[in-house]
A protein has these predicted regions:
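Non-heme Fe(II)/2-oxoglutarate
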Residues: 111-112, 138, 145-212
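Non-heme Fe(II) oxygenase catalytic core, chiefly the N-lobe of the double-stranded beta-helix
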Residues: 1-135, 148-157, 167-177
């Protein structure tokens, strides 16, 4: 809804083929409504003293954001593109990940100390890596990976955008629904990823068919 600059990121060539690969489902029912669905995207601004706690990880297993590799191909429930809109260096509150945690069958022993809504910060968890990014860099990762952020200690604002991709049979996590105005101006490929269940008539005035 924020305009063309953000619409161009829906299927940006730098990562869209990676999303199709990791979400998978080619030649199966998972592609019945198209290759992908974006259930959520947002811009996050973070000032000094702020962070987001660690979350996700392979345990407990969650279908929506699961990592799966089977039969020689990926089938991941949700894959994120995190786009740095500013330089993110030491002290800037960078994204923190625990490598390999998307395959874990056990909860990280320190997770509760640094989880969301706790007083801890991601850089304090054993085995975590804080990722530094230049403006324009994109971090692609399955949402099942344990991730969060470090505490921002520098002045200024960290700015990122996040786009979450999954199979076309998914649904919105929150109550947001795309406006008719947005759907009218999107390309057919982008419209399919934003609203895969709705087939619009040639004028995009009303739904022609809704899939159950």
């Amino acid at each position: 809804e924020a305009g063309e600059a953000f619409e161009r990121l829906i299927d940006h060539p730098a990562w869209i083929e990676h999303m199709k690969l990791f979400v998978g489902g080619q030649g199966t029912f998972d592609h019945a409504h198209g290759p992908l669905f974006i259930d959520e995207n947002f811009v996050n601004l973070r000032g000094a003293g702020k962070a987001i706690g660690m979350h996700s990880g392979g345990y407990p297993s969650i279908l929506r954001n699961q990592y799966r590799f089977h039969g020689g191909r990926f089938m991941c429930g949700q894959v994120n593109a995190l786009i740095a809109l500013t330089n993110i260096g030491l002290g800037d509150g960078g994204t923190v990940i625990v490598p390999g945690s998307h395959k874990s069958n056990f909860e990280h022993p320190d997770l509760k100390k640094v989880a969301m809504r706790s007083e801890g910060f991601g850089e304090l968890i054993e085995g975590a890596i804080e990722i530094q990014m230049a403006a324009g860099d994109v971090l692609v990762f399955v949402d099942g990976l344990c991730h969060g952020s470090a505490k921002r200690s520098n002045s200024g604002i960290r700015r990122i955008a996040v786009y979450r991709y999954g199979p076309s049979w998914g649904n919105f996590r929150h109550q947001y629904r795309p406006s008719k105005e947005l759907l009218k101006r999107l390309t057919p490929e982008r419209r399919q990823m934003v609203a895969p269940y709705i087939m619009w008539d040639s004028e995009f005035n009303q739904p022609e068919k809704t899939h159950a």
